[in-house]
Structures are given as C-alpha cells and as structure tokens.
C-alpha cells in the first residue's frame, strides 16, 4: 500500500485554509472532469482529487491525516499504518467504493462523506434483526438531472448470519432514476435496498445523498445556470451571434451592439428542472477578451482606433 499525500494531490501547503483547499479541489475537478478532459488518466486523477478533498475538506479527517503524516509517509512510497490505528475507526467499516486502500486503512471505520463517485457507509442498528441501512454518496452530473435514463450504481452491503453476526460484505448493483429537481445534499430513500435482514427480519434501506459534480462550463444558482461567454472587442461593440453551449445542445445567442463585460443575458427554460419538471434560466454572462497586439498590423489598428475614438473609460474620475 502506497502513502497518499493529499496536500500534494491538491497542490496546496499543509497550512492551507479551507477556502484554498476547496478552490484547489474545484480547479482539479474541472480540469479532469470526465466530460472534458481527454487525458488518458483523467478519471483516475479526478477520483484522486475527490479522495483528497474527502479528507482535507473534513476537519476531523484532516486532523487525523496530519497526525499520521507525522510518521514520515512519502507520497507514492510504501506505507503501513501504525499498529492499532484502524481501531480508531470504531464500528462497521467503510468498504471500498472508489477510494484507495490507503484511505480505507486510515479511515476504515468512518463514512465516506464527500466521495462524488459513491462510497457506502453502514449504520449499525441495535433493534432486532432488521438489515442495516446503507448510506451512499452519489455523484450526479448536471446533464444527468435532465436525462430519463437510469444510472447504474454499485455499493457494498454487510452480510449477517441467522444470529445477526456479520459474515462479510457483498456487492449490490442497482439501476436508479435521478428524480427531477434534485439538489446538492438532498437525501433520497430507497426502501428495502439496504442490507438483508437476518432471521426473517426486514431489509434495511438505501439512502442516497446527492452530490452535484462540478461542471467545467456552468455554475449553479438554485435552478438557474450561469455560463461565461467570452467576446472579442468588436463582437461586443458591433453586435454578433454567438453559439453558446447548454445542457441540451448549442443555441445562437444575439449579442447587441455596445455590450459590456459583466452583462447577463437571460435564456428562459435552459436551466435545471425543479420538482415539477419546470426548468430555470440560463444566464449568459458576457466577458470581453482582449486579443494580443503582438504584431505590427494589430498595433497599427489599435493606434488608429485610439486616435479616432472619442472614448475615455475613466470619465467618472473627473466628476
């Protein structure tokens, strides 16, 4: 088992605050998002970033990782957890998901609170022989909230004998529909889909906690989506038609003459769906991007414009 230095994975210092850690995670999640990155190992790096944020984004796990880091583990080098460490996890163990053996050996008894690809935790029930409930954090991409197709999930459930004693774990696979209007952190109950009961007891339930995966193009505000639309200066000045991506295909957006950076254009019905299936808005936020003036002809054009244009962007300073 190799040691994983989660600070190195996210590219932050051990002294980084919560804001810096979250920003680093979002940057990597966007860069290696499976829908965007063409790198061969993008999915693995995406999962690795999620695992790092699962630990460093949780104060308790981060403190424990900092403690075990003192034992001299080096990133990518063989590592063995100190004797007795695993016992700190307490009751039923966390099994697999997409987290590494290193994570499981250090936090084996804890839940997988932020794993966007899913990770089960078992909650021990003391009453009767009812099967254990299983908690699964499930990554949902924005496109999936509009899809009518089922999503296949796999997770670990504990097995018990007739005496209610745990005998091991088994993998269970389900096809689930993502309901319209789901939001980050929402908890969905699937009755009877948890661990089997013993001695004729009822099955436990499966609880899905939705985690909306970061998208490389869109930010989310409620059921509205925000996309930044880069414009050339002449497009903003003269007006243009620009092809803008949405969750269900591109649209042609009309840019009016004299548009400014920061302006928002509303596109009705191109946001996320609510519980009733009604969709929010897409807001296209304009951003004027300056081209490089690296060659002589470009500089001549800018020089002529500066000489002929009666424009002072700082007139408010003279008031």
Swiss-Prot record:
GO CC term (a single one): cytoplasm
InterPro entries: DNA-bd_curved-DNA, DnaJ_C, DnaJ_domain, DnaJ_domain_CS, HSP40/DnaJ_pept-bd, J_dom_sf
UniProt xrefs under CDD domains: DnaJ, DnaJ_C
GO BP, sorted A to Z: chaperone cofactor-dependent protein refolding; protein refolding
GO molecular function, one term: bent DNA binding
Primary site of residence: cytoplasm
Task of the protein: DNA-binding protein that preferentially recognizes a curved DNA sequence. It is probably a functional analog of DnaJ; displays overlapping activities with DnaJ, but functions under different conditions, probably acting as a molecular chaperone in an adaptive response to environmental stresses other than heat shock. Lacks autonomous chaperone activity; binds native substrates and targets them for recognition by DnaK. Its activity is inhibited by the binding of CbpM.
Protein name, per record: Curved DNA-binding protein
Gene (name only): cbpA
